[in-house]
Amino acid sequence: MKTVRNIFGTGTLYDSPDLQGKIYATCAACMSVWSDFLSWANVHKERMVKSIEDADTIVVLCCQVTDLAVYNDIKVCERLNKQTGKSIFISGCLAQRFDIDLPDYIKRLDVVRVKNQPLYDKTLVHYEPPFWVKGFEETCETLSLKQGDLFRNFYPLKIGAGCNGNCKYCTIRHTRGEGYEMSARDQVDEFLAFDNVVLISDSPTVKQIKDWCEIAIENNKEISFRNMEPYVLVACEKEVVDLSRKGLLRILHCPIQSFDDEVLKIMNRNIPATKKAVEIMQEVRKSGTLVATNIIIDYVHNGKVYPNYYKQLLEEKFDYFAWNPYFDGHFDLKRAEERFDKYIV
């Protein structure tokens, strides 16, 4: 346990040694956060339980990308607390948000991860269904384009964490713990050992993408990329297109966030790179690569609302897209509940 100060204030964070006995863990966050704790769980497999009734300690991995996500996090914790009467440790991005008040039964846990650890057993950490998809049904498909299912059944190869970007709407650079970047050559054995590999990082670097394109071609093995920023895709255009033309790039996920130059400028995003990235994604589609993206809808700036939902363009340019409603970073439980009812229909 330690006292931590960050841009969100000062608070107490517990560490992995504070987790007692048998542990049940579930994830209501993204694959980056899920695979973090999963790496630790695979090292301490004998302590992980798959039934919450057998647990001494409960961990919920949480998100804070929108107030809807925070609201869902709280609801998951509330459900498990009522079910067991136990305190809940939360890890992931929400744990670092000391400005967001949480129920007394919740304890904040720092980022828990083991670098360069193969994830032999992905079932050690339960994955909550995507809250924005009502009636979500699990599948075993790896090429499902059903909402909320992208990469869900892939093998998450952890190549790093953290982001040095300065997008105005994003706080990842402050909530993901100490950032790191793995050398691709150090993870070749892991890449070869598992099927349906997707690279997992909050923001893969140019060097990582170029190296992994080379490795995939050397080994004639399919790979997928997630969270590749537009400027990275542009810098790696030749390598990515070559990989796709060889039939080895299965899915390319690149978050463009908007088609609108004005909105991109407000977001502090790279406008030329975004436009070029969309062009590159159309090029790799010709070779059979599936392309996916994220956007932020109802973006607010200086009191003006930008709907930012170009449905026809999104359906034309992408095989899969997901959206988040703009979140100003100030969490209010009542407002979050109202917005949850508005957007999750």
Predicted feature residues:
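Structural recognition of alpha->loop->beta junctions
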Residues: L102-D121, A216, V240-C254, N308-A322
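Glycine/threonine-rich flexible loop motifs
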Residues: D67-V76, E178-Y180, E262-R269
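N-terminal [4Fe-4S]-dependent radical SAM core
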Residues: M1-G21, P118-L157
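Canonical Radical SAM [4Fe-4S] cluster-binding loop centered on the CxxxCxxC motif
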Residues: M1, G148-R185
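Aromatic/hydrophobic pocket-lining residues that form the small-molecule binding cavity
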Residues: V70-D73, A184-Q187, I209-W212, C236, ...
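Cofactor-cradling patches in redox/metallo enzymes
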Residues: K2-K122
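Radical SAM enzyme [4Fe-4S]-AdoMet core and its adjacent flexible, acidic
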Residues: V206-N219, E316-V345
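Conserved SAM/AdoMet-binding glycine-rich loop
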Residues: I88-F89, Q96-R97, L192-N302
